[in-house]
Amino acid sequence: MSKAIPKTMKAAVIDKFGGPAVLHVARVPVPEPGEREILVRVHAAGIGSWDPWVREGGMGGTRFPQVIGSDGSGTVVAAGSKVRRFKVGDRVYAYAMDNPKGGFYAEYAAVPEDGAGLAPAGLSLDEAGGLAACGLTAVAGLDALKIAKDAPVMVLGASGGVGHIMLQLAKREGARVLAVASGRDGAALAEGLGADLAVNGKTADVAKAVRGFAPEGLAAALVFANGDKLAPALKLVRKGGTIAYPEGVEPVPRGTAGVKVRSFNGLSGPEAFERLNGLVSLGTFRVEICRTYRLDDLPQAHRDVLKHHLGKLIVKPRA
């Protein structure tokens, strides 16, 4: 590696699986990029609701200390000999779930070339830091639905990390979107992002809102948050329609007879990043950054990510 790249870096690590308190800041070696990997000087890392699951041992593994952090953004400072898509100096965002060389809760991250994309020109690196995992999951949701122009679609959880991105992508696909968000602030966010109708799922009669929005029934529903209160609204997806949800949503949504229910996972690979970038570039796009943390704040961030918040939480390792 270049002499300008240090041998060690500051990172938030875990030495064992457990609660938020196992996260602590330490100095660890800067990872060496392999021949098909890039080394990223991290600007920001997303904090996802799945990160506490990883911290608790959900992905397994026995190598400690372990750096987690499933996605992030930054600048390429070194590239392996067989890397063709990136060069030193490129602004990138990347996905690092289950990456053997560690995640983005660090000053540097080495990731496979195919797990990264050029940061969209219209986004800041703060926004790009929270985009990869949620954006690639949202694109998978589009594929699960195959949304038709002017189709009435409901997004449940429209103010969350994946949901607020899904709302914007669905509008780009030409859908009419009913956004069910968390709280008055969530409904205001969804309205500001272009929802045709935004309601507060905590207080609104969601089924009544659906009947007014789509008298003949919904063509589809994307479920990023669920609960017994929302079940009547899901029954208003019409015959031939689709309910889609990312794996991990509980309780699993159910539809009526003739409605397809599909689960999906986030996409990966160069084509997925290119598709997401293409959708983002179609107009004004926003990754809502709710709060920004430092590395030593991550135990609290892991508590906060499981509570009410809008959009994304991020950590800036160099703050």
Where are these regions (language model features)?
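Glycine-rich cofactor phosphate-binding loops and adjacent beta1-alpha1 units
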Residues: A188-R262
